[in-house]
Amino acid sequence: MRFDVITLFPEFLAQSAGLGVVGRAQEKGLFSLHGWNPRDYAEGNYRRVDDRPFGGGPGMVMLIEPLQACLQAIRDADPTPARVIHLSPQGAPLTQAKVRELAALPRMVLLCGRYEGIDERFLEANVDEEISLGDYVLSGGELGAAVIIDAVARLQDGALNDAESAAQDSFEGDLGLLDCPHYSQPAQHPLGDVPDVLRSGNHAAIAAWRRQQSLVRTAQRRPDLLDEQALGKADRTLLEQGRQVQKQKADP
């Protein structure tokens, strides 16, 4: 996997991608990250990459020419086809399903805008899709690019010490449920004890408990993700039993 990122702040992406799981994946050669600053491709003494918008209004707009030259340099550096993705609040929301789709690509170019945005002509001519982190506005696309790099890199084969870790994450699995609660040492603590079933050694019971917790947690916190009518009989039973337990805890 190769990431090429068009950004005015390539050092930001280099730093964030060098940490933790993603940093280790990069050290293993599971992906490569290349930052490209459009200012390096701007003309004139001031290396200007923005100008005022036609029609007036506040802010500045990123210019076509530096971006076009930057993108051409990326294509010249490696002939491998790349999907060009613009990080934008106008894009489709990023989901785990989209992350899995992107993880199967050999290469992508992440375009990070700044100021009021990018000249629409450049976007129409070069961008394959737009992706958003959510319904809010950031100062630029760099955080969105960092999120995509992190989410995609950890799905590369060998990125995680245990491949099952990714399979058990929130939004994965057959229903895309939220993850279940997790506990570690000590087993007993003033804040509460670890559920007995997790210490029982009964793997079938543990799996059923985790499934139940995922169902209940998804129904409570993200009901938009759960189509209860599509649940099988076993899952419906687990969900109802889990709800009863939650009700008993709330009304002892």
UniProtKB/Swiss-Prot annotation:
InterPro entries, per the entry: Alpha/beta_knot_MTases, tRNA_m1G_MeTrfase_C_sf, tRNA_m1G_MeTrfase_TrmD, tRNA_m1G_MTases_N, tRNA_MeTrfase_TRMD/TRM10
Residues the record lists as binding S-adenosyl-L-methionine: G113, L133, G134, D135, Y136, V137, L138
A GO cellular component annotation in the UniProt record: cytosol
GO biological process: tRNA N1-guanine methylation
HAMAP family per the UniProt record, alphabetical: TrmD
Function: Specifically methylates guanosine-37 in various tRNAs.
Protein name: tRNA (guanine-N(1)-)-methyltransferase
Organism: Stenotrophomonas maltophilia (strain K279a)
Encoding gene, per UniProt annotation: trmD
